[in-house]
């Protein structure tokens, strides 16, 4: 089964680095706690075209379960409904771990 990447975007002005760090560190404990619900990683986004996050989930099912329950909360907190883009990811390359995976299983890649 593939992992699922969800890109969440809010059409809001770019925040200062200080605001972005404060926002990320204040909500990071919530996302750390979602490991039990299938969240593998979250990256906070901040740029000229808006703010948001990139979420890597263990499955689309896990991602849909969480976002379905939380989309209204996110819209209320930011004052605008986010745009969500969904992707299946079959082959992640992780240079921090030095591995390539296919559907969750490490494979040996020969150059």
Q: Residue spans of the language-model regions?
A:
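Short S/T/G/P-rich N-terminal loop/turn motif that feeds into the first structured element of a domain
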Residues: 1-50, 60-68, 83-111
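A short, exposed loop/beta-hairpin motif centered on an aromatic-Gly-Thr core
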Residues: 52-56
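A common structural junction motif
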Residues: 71-78
């Amino acid at each position: 089964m593939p992992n699922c990447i969800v890109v969440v975007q809010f059409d809001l002005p770019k925040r200062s680095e200080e605001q972005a760090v404060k926002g990320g560190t204040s909500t990071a404990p919530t996302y750390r706690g979602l490991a039990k619900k299938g969240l593998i990683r979250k990256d906070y986004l901040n740029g000229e075209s808006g703010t948001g996050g990139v979420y890597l989930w263990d499955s689309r099912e896990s991602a849909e379960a969480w976002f379905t329950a939380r989309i209204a909360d996110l819209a209320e907190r930011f004052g605008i409904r986010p745009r969500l883009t969904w992707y299946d990811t079959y082959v992640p390359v992780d240079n921090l771990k030095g591995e390539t995976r296919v559907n969750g299983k490490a494979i040996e890649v020969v150059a």
